[in-house]
């Protein structure tokens, strides 16, 4: 099974680029930019990656992002992730970034997007890896601030395929952002949102019905509503599930309790992703390995999960078919 996982070409649809900031790069950038970080060494950082819920993770995640200042910093951050893609056979990736995390510190929107974009262009040139960029609004901030961020994104419409919604879920429902999502849709952006990770399944209904999204990030709480499960199945609405993240943030106590196999068996359109891999102990292959070792997943399940990620991506139908053919070739 592990050999199959490593062999298969994959797409990743739920990856926060700031969440791929490894401690080594964090220290290097902190030193270069003369930013104080509350850790004495790399081991100290790894020990701090011991989370009890989404918020305890976010506190550390935002502190880590402080070291990202220049365009080159965002290039290096993205490039290090691309090297992991090469290692894990990811041939298409759709990357989230959180502009508000950076603009709040005085780093310009242009600095962030240009650094990321340059690295992705090099990834295409050197490794043939295709990519899309999705800009996320921070849901703990106001809709008004989200509108400001949307305005900043407009000059970069050609570089950003969609908008999403992330950060602290509890108490920040999708309904808080109806108008800005409506405007984003009018501007031609594709729409996704984190929903049903920690908060209950009502947030998934809101994301579908009020924000009109075309992909749900996480969505594991959907299992608590038979009606919602049936709807997700009927619509083949993609769910970008992140197993390591769910365990690290205590959404499930352990991998054996994870519901990904149940969701898949029900007929939902499920994909596997790494979310914030530097913080959650593993990139995409490790997520696949962890679930395959702890759940009764078959080789066909793994192939389905991989194919779902291409089918649910924002690339052209022609490219999807090319990639699905490559999966079939790898299966042999």
UniProtKB/Swiss-Prot annotation:
Zn(2+) binds at residues 14, 16, 194, 275. It comes from Psychrobacter cryohalolentis (strain ATCC BAA-1226 / DSM 17306 / VKM B-2378 / K5). One of its GO terms (molecular function) is zinc ion binding. Belongs to the metallo-dependent hydrolases superfamily. Adenosine and AMP deaminases family. Adenine deaminase type 2 subfamily. The active site is at residue 197. PANTHER family: ADENINE DEAMINASE (PTHR43114:SF6). GO terms for biological process: adenine catabolic process; hypoxanthine salvage; nucleotide metabolic process. It catalyses: adenine + H2O + H(+) = hypoxanthine + NH4(+). The record marks 218 as: Important for catalytic activity. The keyword Hydrolase applies. Binds 1 zinc ion per subunit. The keyword Metal-binding applies. Substrate binds at residue 276. This is Adenine deaminase.
């Amino acid at each position: 099974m592990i050999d199959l996982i490593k062999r298969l070409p994959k797409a990743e649809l739920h990856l926060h680029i700031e969440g791929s900031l490894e401690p080594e790069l964090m220290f290097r950038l902190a030193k270069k930019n003369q930013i104080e970080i509350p850790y004495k060494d790399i081991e100290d950082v790894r020990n701090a990656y011991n989370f009890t819920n989404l918020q305890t993770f976010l506190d550390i995640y935002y502190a880590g992002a402080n070291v990202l200042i220049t365009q080159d910093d965002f290039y290096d951050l993205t490039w290090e992730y691309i090297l992991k893609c090469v290692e894990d056979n990811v041939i298409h990736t759709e990357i989230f970034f959180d502009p508000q995390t950076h603009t709040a510190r005085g780093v310009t929107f242009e600095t962030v997007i240009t650094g990321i974009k340059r690295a992705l262009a090099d990834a295409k040139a050197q490794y043939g890896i295709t990519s899309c960029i999705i800009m996320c609004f921070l849901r703990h901030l106001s809709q008004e601030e989200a509108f400001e961020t949307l305005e900043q994104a407009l000059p970069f419409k050609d570089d950003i395929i969609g908008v999403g919604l992330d950060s602290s879920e509890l108490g920040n429902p999708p309904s808080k952002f109806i108008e800005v999502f409506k405007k984003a849709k009018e501007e031609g952006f594709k729409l996704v949102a984190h929903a049903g990770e920690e908060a209950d399944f009502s947030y998934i209904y809101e994301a579908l019905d009020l924000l009109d999204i075309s992909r749900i990030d996480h969505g594991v709480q959907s299992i608590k509503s038979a009606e919602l499960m049936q709807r997700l199945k009927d619509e083949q609405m993609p769910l970008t599930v992140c197993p390591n993240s769910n365990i690290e943030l205590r959404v499930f106590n352990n991998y054996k309790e994870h519901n990904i196999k149940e969701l898949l068996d029900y007929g939902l359109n499920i994909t596997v992703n790494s979310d914030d891999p530097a913080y959650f102990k593993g990139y995409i292959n490790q997520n696949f390995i962890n679930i395959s070792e702890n759940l009764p997943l078959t080789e066909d399940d793994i192939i389905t999960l991989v194919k779902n990620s291409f089918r649910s991506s924002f690339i052209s139908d022609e490219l999807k078919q090319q990639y699905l053919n490559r999966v079939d070739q790898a299966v042999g």
